[in-house]
Amino acid sequence: QESTVIVMLTRVNENGRRKCEKYWPDHREQTTFDNLIVSSINVSEYGQIIKRSFQLWNPNQPGKKLLVEQFHYITWPDHGVPITTSDLFNLRRMVIESQGNNPSPIIV
């Protein structure tokens, strides 16, 4: 579906427990999943939001690369809701700006 925006609302680890898998490579690194290469090209922090940019491509389809942006909200509590909403509104604004007119779905 060629989605270009991912929203992540949990930490990888919380209180010593694994909450999700880290499916992305470290900054300026790359990893391979079957026939898909994922390369990390940028990481920026905005308060409680980390924005990661990746380039994805299949080596069997040269010339076709997809830029994907992940927005990682890092302070959603394990139980309950965030104390303030300002970072959530910033997250929403950033996701909308990144998505633009792209009709592909946003992955949450």
UniProtKB/Swiss-Prot annotation:
MF terms from GO for this chain are: protein tyrosine phosphatase activity
**Where, in this chain's numbering, is substrate bound?**
78
The protein, known as? Tyrosine-protein phosphatase 5
What Enzyme Commission number(s) apply to this enzyme?
Answer: 3.1.3.48
The catalysed reaction is: O-phospho-L-tyrosyl-[protein] + H2O = L-tyrosyl-[protein] + phosphate
Which keywords, in A-to-Z order, does the entry hold?
Hydrolase, Protein phosphatase
The record's section on Gene3D superfamilies has: Protein tyrosine phosphatase superfamily
Q: Which PANTHER family match?
A: RECEPTOR-TYPE TYROSINE-PROTEIN PHOSPHATASE (PTHR19134), TYROSINE-PROTEIN PHOSPHATASE NON-RECEPTOR TYPE 7 (PTHR19134:SF527)
The family annotation for this protein states:
Belongs to the protein-tyrosine phosphatase family.
Q: Which CDD domains match?
A: PTPc
The record, for Pfam families, names:
Y_phosphatase
> The organism sits in which domain of life?
Eukaryota
Please list the residue ranges annotated as the Tyrosine-protein phosphatase domain: 1-108
Q: Which InterPro entries match?
A: Prot-tyrosine_phosphatase-like, Protein-Tyr_Phosphatase, PTP_cat
